[in-house]
Amino acid sequence: MQHKLLINGERVSGEGEKQPVYNPATGDVLLEIAEVSAEQVDAAVRAADAAFAEWGQTTPKARAECLLKLADVIEENGQVFAELESRNCGKPLHSAFNDEIPAIVDVFRFFAGAARCLNGLAAGEYLEGHTSMIRRDPLGVVASIAPWNYPLMMAAWKLAPALAAGNCVVLKPSEITPLTALKLAELAKDIFPAGVINILFGRGKTVGDPLTGHPKVRMVSLTGSIATGEHIISHTASSIKRTHMELGGKAPVIVFDDADIEAVVEGVRTFGYYNAGQDCTAACRIYAQKGIYDTLVEKLGAAVATLKSGAPDDESTELGPLSSLAHLERVSKAVEEAKATGHIKVITGGEKRKGNGYYYAPTLLAGALQDDAIVQKEVFGPVVSVTPFDNEEQVVNWANDSQYGLASSVWTKDVGRAHRVSARLQYGCTWVNTHFMLVSEMPHGGQKLSGYGKDMSLYGLEDYTVVRHVMVKH
């Protein structure tokens, strides 16, 4: 099993303290991996900085060819990656292989193409005897911090645009779910020049802090919690690094009386509970207009009750375990606090699964009020709340009354209403009559405490560049 890291083109073992990596479906330790030392963090950053001198000057074609090769080897090793992701994260194996691996491959292929389409502005004369041009150039060394919910996918989202733009990367996956990133290191070693990609292992305090605070790191990209984002922004403030933050969400799902209820039920059953709800865009905060509220709660409760939790390697499993024991306890605590309000009703679920592993039952809570913690705070588990609303104005205000601003959806047959509401929602993405749909060509990113910066799309590529003006006198 993967345990070696990648520093300056060499696969090495960490020199720091060993950390256990668990199988969340059983609670068993899969293996122990040694963290990198502070000296190894420094070596990785310096290797990336040295490699940037050449990699930053390569042609878009050359960078694209490397990204395409990496996409190909990920696709060829798709089963291996899916099995590692399933064992380390608890994801259903069929979901990892059929849903995530193709999307990951597509991200690398998209940015391979996008690398060849990134241009500055054409030259022009704005001062007599001088010609100006605008360049988009790479920044240098990017420190990327990936989360534990989609380890390989988030590694792809961070590596692909940074490399396509001509940057060099030092990636730290979550210490909870490092295995697919370490497998990626093994495959990337012979594709990219030494130092262009470096992949480390370790905790935030021991590895993340020295990495993000390193003086030669020019940009830090994080997908993680608000608390982690606040820490990194504060930690890097003195060195004025560029930061790119995706910090979670609490997606409002606005269901009007005229919505197709069957489509809503089918959608939320999938989009609210995919990956055991461990998704920052999960359809977890439903606002149902009072005319259809009771019907929606009844039908959705019946549908959610049919979701099957089970072993990740079982083809019939729809929900695996949560990622860690600590996270299981956080999710359980959030639901217990909701139940204690007295007015929130558990329609289905609401408890830990008995037996081994970190399983929580798919849960639907009805009667939640706007100010309830279950409505306002991200649970990041298989938990969906439903709140009744009266009219369009009220629900738009409630939807926007949140510290988060990542994703949202509107369900209605009224095209005018769909446009009106979508225009007023303070979220990076709004879906209409669907939810959770992501494509490489479109940007993903938030507002408010959900962060700033875009993943995927040409906008994501531009985030990893600096705009420069060059003026030539003649």
UniProtKB/Swiss-Prot annotation:
InterPro entries found in the cross-reference section: Ald_DH/histidinol_DH, Ald_DH_C, Ald_DH_CS_GLU, Ald_DH_N, Aldehyde_DH_dom, Aminobutyraldehyde_DH, PatD
Alphabetized SUPFAM superfamilies for the sequence: ALDH-like (SSF53720)
GO molecular function, one term: aminobutyraldehyde dehydrogenase (NAD+) activity
Residues involved in NAD(+) binding: A146, P147, W148, K172, P173, S174, E175, D209, S225, I226, A227, T228, C280
GO BP: L-lysine catabolic process; putrescine catabolic process
Active site: E246, C280
Pfam families: Aldedh (PF00171)
Record's catalysed reaction(s): 4-aminobutanal + NAD(+) + H2O = 4-aminobutanoate + NADH + 2 H(+); 5-aminopentanal + NAD(+) + H2O = 5-aminopentanoate + NADH + 2 H(+)
Pathway assigned in UniProt: Amine and polyamine degradation; putrescine degradation; 4-aminobutanoate from 4-aminobutanal: step 1/1; Amino-acid degradation
Enzyme superclass (EC): oxidoreductase
Keyword annotations from UniProtKB, A to Z: NAD, Oxidoreductase
E.C. number(s) listed in UniProt: 1.2.1.19, 1.2.1.-
Family designation: Belongs to the aldehyde dehydrogenase family. Gamma-aminobutyraldehyde dehydrogenase subfamily.
Subunit and partners: Homotetramer.
Main function: Catalyzes the oxidation 4-aminobutanal (gamma-aminobutyraldehyde) to 4-aminobutanoate (gamma-aminobutyrate or GABA). This is the second step in one of two pathways for putrescine degradation, where putrescine is converted into 4-aminobutanoate via 4-aminobutanal. Also functions as a 5-aminopentanal dehydrogenase in a a L-lysine degradation pathway to succinate that proceeds via cadaverine, glutarate and L-2-hydroxyglutarate.
Additional note from the record: 4-aminobutanal can spontaneously cyclize to 1-pyrroline, and 5-aminopentanal to 1-piperideine.
PANTHER family reported for this sequence: ALDEHYDE DEHYDROGENASE-RELATED
Name recorded for this polypeptide: Gamma-aminobutyraldehyde dehydrogenase
Native organism taxonomy: Bacteria, Pseudomonadati, Pseudomonadota, Gammaproteobacteria, Enterobacterales
Gene assigned in the entry: patD
